[in-house]
Amino acid sequence: MSLQDPIADLFTRIRNGQSAKKVSVTMPNSKLKVAVAKVLKNEGYIADFAINGDVKPELSIELKYFEGKAVIENIQRVSRPGLRIYKRRDELPKVMGGLGIAIVSTSKGLMTDRAARSAGVGGEIIGFVA
């Protein structure tokens, strides 16, 4: 099975896992998915992630809940393969007035919108998390 948009698949698996109250979700591994998982973990949206398996590695993301409610209220893809969205550093969006994050792919790697602003770089808006 080939995925046309692996990041949209990652976001959908997280959304579906949290709506079903799953402890963790697994998916095929890629460097970009691991980078997104690192950003989500550093910002406190997921509990942890791990890469399992040698021959066919899978990324396992441990979902996070607070008082029985999912920590991630909204996670959505912005830039997609058919329509890439790029923004300069002064055009980077603030999600929910700064309460959420935008995941940005920059020349310095994947980071949040706040980190990209402070680093003085823009890039492709991967998605919004709130």
UniProtKB/Swiss-Prot annotation:
**Presence of the UniProt keyword Transferase in the record:** no
* A GO CC term assigned to this protein in UniProt: ribosome
Acyltransferase found in the keyword field: no
Name a biological process GO annotation. Answer: translation
UniProt keyword terms in alphabetical order:
Ribonucleoprotein, Ribosomal protein, RNA-binding, rRNA-binding
| InterPro entries reported for this sequence | Ribosomal_uS8 (IPR000630), Ribosomal_uS8_CS (IPR047863), Ribosomal_uS8_sf (IPR035987)
Could you tell me which Pfam families the record lists for this protein?
Answer: Ribosomal_S8
Q: Which GO terms describe its molecular function?
A: rRNA binding; structural constituent of ribosome
Q: To which protein family does this belong? A: Belongs to the universal ribosomal protein uS8 family.
The subunit field of the Swiss-Prot or TrEMBL record says: Part of the 30S ribosomal subunit. Contacts proteins S5 and S12.
Q: Which PANTHER family match?
A: 40S RIBOSOMAL PROTEIN S15A
Task of the protein: One of the primary rRNA binding proteins, it binds directly to 16S rRNA central domain where it helps coordinate assembly of the platform of the 30S subunit.
Q: What is this protein called?
A: Small ribosomal subunit protein uS8
